[in-house]
Amino acid sequence: VTTNLSHKNSIKPSNQLFGTLPGLQVLQKAGTVWENGATLYIRGNSSLNSNSPLVLVDGFERSIDELSSEEIESISVLKDAVATSLYGIRGANGVILVKTKRGSVGAPKITFSYEFNMASPKRLPKFADGYTYAMALNEAMENDGLAPRYSGTELDAFKNQTYPGVYPNVDWLDESLRDMSYGDNVNFTAQGGSQFVRYYTMLNFLDNRGLLKPTSDNDGYSTQLKYSRLNVRTNLDITVSPTTTVQLNLLGNFTEHNRPGESTDKIFNALFQVPSGAFPV
């Protein structure tokens, strides 16, 4: 079974495989889409040991997430007796064969594409303001037989924002998140050749900037979620004789990943758990 990923818009090729190949289970991990590739199963998660299939890119074992979808020609899945007969114990959990694009006989063909994408949260909850939080806290303490935490004067200060430094009303989502995340995907390919030499060359630059608002308080440090990747590939096919063809595959992968000191999960947990009246900005 083969599939083509050129029409998929996910960043990680492993995530792009969802729903494309019969018998392949794709489990996307938590966190941002560029932080974690998917976990792949062919025979299912049936043991305590590794259930990951063997992934071969042009015959060599490597992660599929090191590639860009633009350079992938096709993906095949081998399982059961076929996988074990060809690859032995290494193919016990199935085999995923990835073929990258190659040159063909003909005039040079050059393509260039640019994609700009934006994404926004589908739905964000509306949290209680500082005054509502203070009222709810007073009610909770009274229900427990305790004295109210805030007096009437303090409640008025929350409501009217008379002293915001002492009785704050902070919208943590608005303070921490942008309305949109942005990304660029630039792709350049050239392919062609003669009956003796055929070539395929690709340059792919991917840049994604997340929802967190960047800060400029400290030079050289940014809290923004950012993922940049440059992929360079050249595949050569050289026909030496009618019975001999030499293949040369070159791949370069350069990645820059910037994130805050905490994980994405912890950041959003804090945004959802810290009350608006806890402390000022």
Predicted feature residues:
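Outer-membrane beta-barrel and related beta-rich outer-membrane complex signature
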Residues: 121-130, 211-215, 247-278
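Short, small/polar-rich motifs associated with maturation and membrane association
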Residues: 1-234, 240, 245-247
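Extended ligand-binding clefts on enzyme/binding-domain cores
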Residues: 59, 279-280
